[in-house]
């Protein structure tokens, strides 16, 4: 079993863990969720801008930049068409049944590209692969919390909510497996996933931080970015 697949399995487990937080009534960790989202926003933004994008543009030039934009807009389109109600964190009020289904469908594409990002990172090198994995892992638990709570709020059972988080994990693993087999994803996967990662950091996570208006959340964004820089330096500083 290759390293990318092992890391994808770990990321999938974090999705399920996020679902367990909700389905087992362990709801006392909202502050922890908030800080984790802020830390993940800073780390993911740094990974996308300082590691994934430079390598993508160095290898593919202007054409790669277009592919990055396609990845960004693809997630934007799916979230605004399928999941207009989507936001990271726990859903606390009742929503319609379609909202739960659409949230799961939209996130399945997103988590598939999490797997593509992990596989593409490891195809470049172990340093980039590991840093991309950490960035993805940091938002996997809030992601599991999100889909489980939205499904519960839309009238689904706890078993179905937990099954939804497991489906997200399966999509991540599939992203790795498909990338390993599909030549087009091997060539363009890093550029696409750079766009997806940039969208998740800048358009999903950062608005959650800004909405909180919390000093600790704002600081954690900087801590997340600083931790990326430290890890990048310790691992050799070469994407």
Task: Show the residue positions of the predicted features.
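Intrinsically disordered, metal-sensing/regulatory segments
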Residues: 1-239
């Amino acid at each position: 079993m290759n390293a990318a697949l092992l890391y994808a399995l770990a990321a999938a487990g974090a999705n399920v863990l996020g679902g367990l937080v909700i389905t087992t009534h362990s709801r006392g960790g909202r502050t922890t969720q908030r800080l984790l989202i802020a830390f993940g926003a800073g780390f993911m933004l740094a990974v996308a801008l300082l590691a994934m994008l430079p390598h993508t543009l160095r290898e593919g030039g202007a054409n790669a930049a277009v592919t990055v934009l396609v990845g960004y807009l693809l997630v934007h389109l799916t979230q605004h068409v399928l999941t207009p109600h989507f936001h990271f964190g726990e859903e606390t009020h009742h929503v319609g049944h379609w909202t739960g289904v659409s949230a799961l469908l939209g996130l399945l594409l997103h988590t598939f590209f999490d797997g593509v990002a992990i596989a593409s990172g490891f195809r470049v090198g172990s340093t980039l692969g590991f840093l991309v994995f950490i960035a993805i892992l940091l938002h996997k638990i809030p992601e599991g919390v999100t889909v489980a709570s939205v499904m519960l709020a839309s009238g689904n059972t706890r078993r179905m909510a937990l099954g939804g988080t497991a489906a997200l994990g399966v999509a991540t693993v599939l992203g790795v497996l498909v990338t390993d087999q599909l030549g087009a994803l091997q060539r363009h996967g890093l550029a696409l996933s750079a766009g997806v990662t940039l969208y998740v950091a800048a358009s999903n996570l950062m608005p959650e931080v800004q909405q909180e208006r919390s000093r600790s959340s704002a600081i954690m964004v900087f801590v997340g970015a600083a931790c990326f820089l430290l890890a990048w330096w310790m691992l050799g500083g070469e994407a």
